[in-house]
Structure formats: structure tokens, C-alpha cells
Amino acid sequence: MKRLVAIILAAVSLGATAQTSAQFKEKFDRQVRSVGAAGVGVEYILDKWASAYPEDTDMLEGRFNYYLAKSRSEEVQKVDAEKYLGQKPVLSLKDTLGKKVNYFTVPVFNDSLFRISQKSIDKAIELAPNALVYRFDKIGALAVYEKDSPDMAATAMLDLIDYDAAKHPAWMFNGEPVSREDFEAAVQEYCYMFYRTGSPNSYESFRILSERMLKENPKSTLFLNNLGAYWQVARRDDKKAAKYYKKVLKLAPGDETATANMKIIEKNKSKKK
């Protein structure tokens, strides 16, 4: 009888102290707001949360963010460019020959910690394949990690587009359904990120993703404008760029982007005469 009472009391005690997943998330979010994504006490909460709910996708995203932040630091590096990763230099000096030398703030990563972050978000994607937020978490992290050569990020985005085209999943983002327009707009955000980076490799990723999206929607003025921008800015080929802008204007005569860029092309053409 005493043993039975002890078991009952232990069960009652456990029920009173056990935390729900929502309570762990609330405590985690509060700690992050207080000390930052990789601050003191964050890992302790994540470990307790993971022990109680090892397949909680919110916990896995939390671990992803923790290890991503833990892996990242910044350095000031000399780069032979006027812009790097879409940013202006934080410092410009002259060398002994009078040549301008630019210094930029550049993200650097601890590879082993970064791999842990990727493993965590991969598990979240496996458990919730229709949750776009986890896929975008992964792609965004890869893009920052790779800096001016976003090959893995572009491949991950292409895989996402292919998966969307083949499976037509009912995408969700933070619990809300994602429309076709929302999906295309989200892809465009990453296209713009590659465009803004402004390196030869990132421009190619910008082109490849835009062309892939046009296979699914050949009349998308969004991605037709992208290809116009690619040829106009990355390749300096106004003639080829104009072909895409003219396609846009046939589909949407009032399109502001195509109209503005055609004016620039016409202005450049008149200067050459």
C-alpha cells in the first residue's frame, strides 16, 4: 500500500512539474529576447526541451537559430571591389602607390557549429515537409554562409521549386496557407538576394532561378523583369535586356519596372549615337 501511494505521489508530482511544449517555447522565446539567440541560458532551455520533446519542430528551429548564431562572427577584410555582398566598404584607404583599398565587414563561420544548425533544420523539414519557414531558414543560412558563391543555396532553392512543381504541396508558413502568388513572391525575395550580392556566381544563380520559375509560369512579369535585369546589369547587354522588358510591357503595359528600365536603355542608346 505504501509503495502504491509513493507511485501515485510521484506521478502527481511529475504531472505538476512537467512542462508542455508551448511552455518550453514561451520560456525559450523570452530568454532569446532577453539575451539574444546564442546568449546565456538558451542552450540549457533547448537541451531540456529536446529531452522532453525530441521531435518538436519549434525546438529544432530554435536549435538551428542557436547554433547558426553561435557559429557566426564578423571580420573586417580587404576586398578588391567597390561593393561586396551588396554592401559599401566600412573603410577606404590608399596604399603606398595611391591605389584605393577597401575594407568590408564579412561574416565568417565555425564550420562544425554551422553543420549542427543545418542538421537541426533538416530534421524539422523532414518532420514538417510542407512548412516553408524551415526550408527558407535553411536556404537563407546557406546563402549567408557561402557569401559571394551561393551554389548550395541556389541548389536548395531549385530543389524546392522542383518539389513544388512535382508535388503541388499545400504549403504553410507559420500556420497560414501559402497562395501561389505568395510562393512566387517568396522565391523572388531570394532571387533579389542573389542579385543584390552582385558577384558573377550570384548573378548566375539569379538567372537560373528566374528561368526555372518561368518554366512554371511563362507569363510571370516578375521573373521576366528579372531576366531583363540580368542582361542589363550583369551582362551589359541592353539589346537582350530590352527583349524581356518588351515582353513584360505586352503583358502589363503599365509595369513600372520594365518602363523605367526601358527608359534607361533608350537613354544609353541615344548617348552612343
What are these regions (language model features)?
Residues 21-24, 57-58, 132-133, 168, ...:
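Helix-start (N-cap) detector for alpha-helical repeat units in TPR-like alpha-solenoids
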Residues 54-55, 129-130, 165-166, 218-219, ...:
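Short coil turns that delineate tetratricopeptide repeat
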